[in-house]
Amino acid sequence: MSRIGRLPIAIPNGVTVTVSPENVVTVKGPKGELTKTMHPNIDIAIEENSVIVTRKNDEKQNRSLHGLTRSLVNNMVVGVTEGYEKKLELVGVGYRAQLQGKKLVLNLGFSHPVEIEAKEGVEFQLDGTNKITVKGIDKELVGAVASDIRSWRKPEPYKGKGIKYENEAIRRKEGKTGKK
């Protein structure tokens, strides 16, 4: 048995989990609703106040899908109760962020400002002009949007300029030493 997959997922109060015969898992909670189609070789059962994930047989693919499916369902339950957020920092002279409605506008040293539309289920918050918070209930979507924002200007190793995650450590390099 998978160490992760065999653990039951506790369903908190105010959260409902339903599984259709086609293995479509729907989780409803105070922050919203998430739906995801799971692999057909994995069985998902709801017993009392917990979700139990089992696999049909011990094929290698099913063993790897077992823990994955349990983690995906758990992420859905946590998402609709607490939500997820990723924090980004803009480091560099003239690097700024501002909100225009649901749109995030970044000045990153290009000849034009970069505009990023908020996808469905994701919202942006600003703390000053150089800290961005991406919030949502879908962990995968929040991470993808934060990664898209970061990809506009990844931190460079010499001065550390760019967009970095809040707790990310940038490996710094030394510049040229010059002739003596």
From Swiss-Prot:
The gene is rplF. This protein binds to the 23S rRNA, and is important in its secondary structure. It is located near the subunit interface in the base of the L7/L12 stalk, and near the tRNA binding site of the peptidyltransferase center. This is Large ribosomal subunit protein uL6. SUPFAM superfamilies: Ribosomal protein L6. Keywords: Ribonucleoprotein, Ribosomal protein, RNA-binding, rRNA-binding. Belongs to the universal ribosomal protein uL6 family. One of its GO terms (cellular component) is cytosolic large ribosomal subunit. GO terms for biological process: cytoplasmic translation. GO terms for molecular function: rRNA binding; structural constituent of ribosome. InterPro entries: Ribosomal_uL6-like, Ribosomal_uL6-like_a/b-dom_sf, Ribosomal_uL6_a/b-dom, Ribosomal_uL6_bac-type, Ribosomal_uL6_CS. The keyword Ribonucleoprotein applies. The keyword tRNA processing does not apply. Part of the 50S ribosomal subunit. NCBIfam families: L6_bact.
